[in-house]
Amino acid sequence: MSSSPVNVKKLKVSELKEELKKRRLSDKGLKAELMERLQAALDDEEAGGRPAMEPGNGSLDLGGDSAGRSGAGLEQEAAAGGDEEEEEEEEEEEGISALDGDQMELGEENGAAGAADSGPMEEEEAASEDENGDDQGFQEGEDELGDEEEGAGDENGHGEQQPQPPATQQQQPQQQRGAAKEAAGKSSGPTSLFAVTVAPPGARQGQQQAGGKKKAEGGGGGGRPGAPAAGDGKTEQKGGDKKRGVKRPREDHGRGYFEYIEENKYSRAKSPQPPVEEEDEHFDDTVVCLDTYNCDLHFKISRDRLSASSLTMESFAFLWAGGRASYGVSKGKVCFEMKVTEKIPVRHLYTKDIDIHEVRIGWSLTTSGMLLGEEEFSYGYSLKGIKTCNCETEDYGEKFDENDVITCFANFESDEVELSYAKNGQDLGVAFKISKEVLAGRPLFPHVLCHNCAVEFNFGQKEKPYFPIPEEYTFIQNVPLEDRVRGPKGPEEKKDCEVVMMIGLPGAGKTTWVTKHAAENPGKYNILGTNTIMDKMMVAGFKKQMADTGKLNTLLQRAPQCLGKFIEIAARKKRNFILDQTNVSAAAQRRKMCLFAGFQRKAVVVCPKDEDYKQRTQKKAEVEGKDLPEHAVLKMKGNFTLPEVAECFDEITYVELQKEEAQKLLEQYKEESKKALPPEKKQNTGSKKSNKNKSGKNQFNRGGGHRGRGGFNMRGGNFRGGAPGNRGGYNRRGNMPQRGGGGGGSGGIGYPYPRAPVFPGRGSYSNRGNYNRGGMPNRGNYNQNFRGRGNNRGYKNQSQGYNQWQQGQFWGQKPWSQHYHQGYY
């Protein structure tokens, strides 16, 4: 770690953001990412001959006693500090981020002895940031980097950092700043999201041991800043290894781990309201345009259906989005034009050595997937000057950029079908030749694939093309209707749409069933699962870049988060869907299915025999590696609930064990889970807080009553200048207007002091989230009283905000606020 006086590991999230703002760096992201970014900035300041910010210059002074405080102590101090309102808010947020003890258990399992105290706290805090952050869950980056650096930090057993002589703080050699930073070739500036190469655990440990030997042999010149003399080097190095331990890196967490974490959010969320119906648009079906049915859910198409872009908010910036035109052709000489109108900025991603903007344009069959160039009979020309088909790439033509126009030609009249391109009117030659026998008369459809870019099409609707085309070619819109082939159409009514929810433990065989069922019904279903999200992230070239920078784990972490938003979008589309997730808890089943009101809602339960399940999980672990901790599987077994037809399903199918046999097996699983796992922590209802002179939030009125805030015998009997009644008592502060509100009765139990009227109350008859705070206009609606202050921090707001799809911030990506109507998504 750095020798800077700012101990990054001891800072809270608010302090990390403050330090980053002072250095004009972004303060968005998870706690571990903020730590990494700040540490990199401090290292660069030292390497550049500029001392890190001193405490006297505005930096936080964490030396002395404050450096020795544990993370739990800091949280307690934060909860106790500030005024009374901030105290209650922090207590509420601690209750929200509890995660039923799951994050704590995961941290204890994955941490080493030296990091056992800090790991669970940080993972819980990171989960709280992700759910209740200021940016509504808009948090990008990888927290695994912060965990690894923390596990490798120079700490003793109590989390204290050894004091270092100021004179040695400027002597850290550049080669000791970390092999990861050298591999990225970075000499100055903040660390980017993808710029650090993560070494395997064995290599990391070997580097630490080799570094220890060099320090011991090389004396003070090459040693760690603040280290003892050369004679004590070996002793301290050995002691440091024992105290520090080896923390399990986050790369060991596979896809199942992040699915498990995301699934847990449903157990603490409120049931969402059904989404707003999609507007029925009357559109001329004979016009060639972008097809709103044959496109990705996150492919945002304009009202006129002639321009589009990929969604770039939150983790969607990692995804590629594609779409096809509504008509294809199989004869003649046909063309269309595509213009790159914008490379959409994605400032919430800190990227380097990664291409985050890309466009592929070309042709494909209607049976091909949306990832242009990744399958057979899918032909694309890339913005990078590369042609792609069936994942095979080859240099072609030249690169193109914003405001360039690409004309795509298809010649079906030659001996072989020829696909060629032109850039800004300049012919680039033939890119692909397809055998007519192999193509077998099947039509080719215009197809585009975008990655954080916006495009515009001319299928022939413009009076004048962007650039002149050869006389023998015709725009596809001008081809006679009988010579065009219409792409597949979706259901016309929502009652004709079908949603199938898979239910089963990880590795039970759900994806196998989905693959088989989709193959039996080609083109019918859109599969919503982590695998499909990963496919849209890991397009061949992008996957290689991510692998080179060691950030594939970032995609695994973001995929389940994107999937939740995909489900919300899907509920507004008239399509058929399969939800390929575990969905074992009744809460997850109910909250997802209530979004699809009006659909034919079906459940498919995959529950094999216990012996078969063990064999399948063992086989999966051998092939893919174990990606889910054992205790997480046990908890899912304990939460496994079979669906009921009367609740939210119209039809339930049991693939292997039938309902009676499956129910017996689940009872066995629940007993196994109960014996193996510790008792779950009860959710904080506020009743225990009363013994500590704390307010009973969400139980009684804020202005008084038995446990009211500031009421009799609360907060040490502090009556704050008034009679021994509640906070809104009669003669409080010299007959000033009463602050408390509520119904009838006395201000405090047993005291005959009248209360204030209901409507001017600061928090009326019920809790803080009820009715009003300072008058009838609501700060929080009447029913939003579950997690305090009326903000409804449940599933359908803030980080999981359903309403954000209907509000302005979703459409704040200029210039799309002028081109797209808000009701579309």
Curated annotation (Swiss-Prot):
One of its GO terms (biological process) is negative regulation of kinase activity. Cleaved at Asp-100 by CASP3 during T-cell apoptosis, resulting in a loss of DNA- and chromatin-binding activities. Extensively phosphorylated. Phosphorylated on Ser-59 by PLK1 and dephosphorylated by protein phosphatase 2A (PP2A) in mitosis. Residues 488-672 are annotated as: ATPase domain. It is found in: Nucleus; Nucleus matrix; Chromosome; Nucleus speckle. The modification Phosphoserine is found at S4, S59, S66, S267, S271. Residues 82-95, 120-134, 140-153 have a biased composition (Acidic residues). The keyword Phosphoprotein applies. ATP binds at G504, L505, P506, G507, A508, G509, K510, T511. There is a cross-link at K265 (Glycyl lysine isopeptide (Lys-Gly) (interchain with G-Cter in SUMO1)). SUPFAM superfamilies: Concanavalin A-like lectins/glucanases, P-loop containing nucleoside triphosphate hydrolases, SAP domain. One of its GO terms (cellular component) is cell surface. The modification ADP-ribosylserine is found at S187. GO terms for molecular function: actin binding; ATP binding; chromatin binding; chromatin DNA binding; DNA binding; double-stranded DNA binding; double-stranded RNA binding; identical protein binding. The modification N6-acetyllysine is found at K17, K21, K186, K265, K352, K516, K524, K551, K565, K635, K814. The modification Citrulline is found at R255. Residues 233-266, 671-683 have a biased composition (Basic and acidic residues). Residues 714-739 are annotated as: RNA-binding RGG-box. Residues 72-81, 159-178, 199-211, 778-799 have a biased composition (Low complexity). The SAP domain is necessary for specific binding to nuclear scaffold/matrix attachment region (S/MAR) elements in DNA. The RNA-binding RGG-box region is necessary for its association with inactive X chromosome (Xi) regions and to chromatin-associated RNAs (caRNAs). Both the DNA-binding domain SAP and the RNA-binding RGG-box region are necessary for the localization of Xist RNA on the Xi. The ATPase and RNA-binding RGG-box regions are necessary for oligomerization. PANTHER family: HETEROGENEOUS NUCLEAR RIBONUCLEOPROTEIN U, HETEROGENEOUS NUCLEAR RIBONUCLEOPROTEIN U FAMILY MEMBER. It is linked to Developmental and epileptic encephalopathy 54: A form of epileptic encephalopathy, a heterogeneous group of severe early-onset epilepsies characterized by refractory seizures, neurodevelopmental impairment, and poor prognosis. Development is normal prior to seizure onset, after which cognitive and motor delays become apparent. DNA- and RNA-binding protein involved in several cellular processes such as nuclear chromatin organization, telomere-length regulation, transcription, mRNA alternative splicing and stability, Xist-mediated transcriptional silencing and mitotic cell progression. Plays a role in the regulation of interphase large-scale gene-rich chromatin organization through chromatin-associated RNAs (caRNAs) in a transcription-dependent manner, and thereby maintains genomic stability. (Microbial infection) Negatively regulates immunodeficiency virus type 1 (HIV-1) replication by preventing the accumulation of viral mRNA transcripts in the cytoplasm. This is Heterogeneous nuclear ribonucleoprotein U.
